[in-house]
Amino acid sequence: MMTRLCADDPARLRAVLAGLRRYQAAPPAPPRTMRPEIARIGSVSLKDHGGSGPPVVVIPSLINPAHVLDLAPDNSLLAGLVARGLNPLLVDWGETAPLGIEQLIAERLVPVIAGLGQPVALAGYCLGGTLALAAAALLGPQVSRVALLATPWNFAGYDAARPRLADWWARTEPLATQLGVLPIELLQPAFWALDEAGVVAKYAR
């Protein structure tokens, strides 16, 4: 992809590859602080990130690990919520059993939130926002409000990427079927296909 998009600009390709090497050589993230688990249903758990204010159930994407919202003390959405007087409770999907989206919401997410037995706000990131909306509809008055962060809502906006996505899936589906899962290494190119120029620009900086 990078060589294709930079075919007419060797200097830009060199900059992109240099940026990619810097990314690959970056030091690993610091060890994460283990958070207490306050609820669990199957593979889905709630982790308490502290704070004494109103509870906010934070729902990450199914694709990213939960700690993407708590990368480091100085780079943490959850630490920011605590600093603002809230009590963030992070949903950790764990190694999710082979459930459909409807089952995951109705049999895992909704019961683990309902078990708190008190009104909560929901904050959903990316696909987690879509799941938060469904959970809020099922939980009714227990949910006081919903905040959505980077949640997809206009799926008609990717017409230019559809041929690339169709080609990616035609090559990926047989392997995913054989594995029984879709590993992130196979899924990542689908995200790249949505904005190839943006991926190149990120590494060219």
Regions inferred by a protein language model and the residue ranges of each:
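Alpha/beta-hydrolase-fold enzymes
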Residues: 1, 117, 133-205
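A structural boundary/capping signal
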Residues: 3-4, 49, 102, 120, ...
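N-terminal targeting or regulatory segments adjacent to alpha/beta-hydrolase or S9 domains
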Residues: 1-29
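The conserved SAM/SAH-binding core of class I Rossmann-like methyltransferase domains
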Residues: 91, 125, 149
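Gly/Ala-rich beta-loop-alpha elbow adjacent to hydrolase catalytic centers
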Residues: 123-128, 132
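Short, surface-exposed "cap/lid" segments of acyl-processing enzymes
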Residues: 26-94
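A structural signal for isolated positions on well-ordered beta-strands in alpha/beta enzyme cores
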Residues: 89, 121, 145-147
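Catalytic nucleophile-loop/oxyanion-hole region of alpha/beta-hydrolase
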Residues: 94-119
